[in-house]
């Protein structure tokens, strides 16, 4: 190969190498000094099929800083995020605890709606039954409380009926069993795997307050998520960083 040809190859290749190296550095830039919290949830297909409406559950995930009490949403299904309740103006019983988080984050007294929805960055389509995975990026070693709230519409049982013949009370929102709240406290140390525990059931304006402990008359709702885990993992390099 002639020296002139070698120079041409180098002249052409060097900028490509520099560009490629720059892309790699840029992709890793957002991971330096960070760690990811990975949420892995399995939605029980059988319970979804057996529910009155056959729709996947509405749920939200958020993190709380135990030192300040501040909260930030990691993920919320679209129906709750925008208030899309198919003809109903509001369904305050869907995710009562997360709605309070939304109000603080958005400085409002109202529930999410089309005019003022939850942030697009944390909103996602309602996952189909099966595995759902999402991540949040945080500083290593930080202490957190994770909250997960879930409701499967129309998962009626003998205690929570569509229409109670004795009390003559109708479930006007189609809620079924009340939303359940899961909780986990952990430190963001890579390699840790945490399993959240059920913390209570969420019933707005009840005599016991919005959060009721222990569970009352709950049956199948505890199996809507038949697997939940929180893992502290290395961040994935990305050219476009979508982590929250």
Where are these regions (language model features)?
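Short beta-strand/loop motifs in extracellular/secreted proteins, especially
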Residues: 57-59, 72
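Structured domain cores in non-transmembrane regions
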Residues: 66-157
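Hydrophobic membrane-insertion alpha-helices, especially the h-region
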Residues: 9-28
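Glycine-rich, aromatic-bearing surface loops/beta-hairpins
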Residues: 134-244
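Ser/Thr/Pro/Gly-rich low-complexity linker/stalk segments immediately outside membranes or between
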Residues: 27-40
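Short amphipathic, basic-aromatic surface patches that mediate peripheral association
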Residues: 37-54, 79, 156
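Beta-strand signatures of extracellular beta-sandwich domains
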Residues: 60-64
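Short, Lys/Arg-rich N-terminal segment immediately upstream of the first membrane anchor
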Residues: 1-7
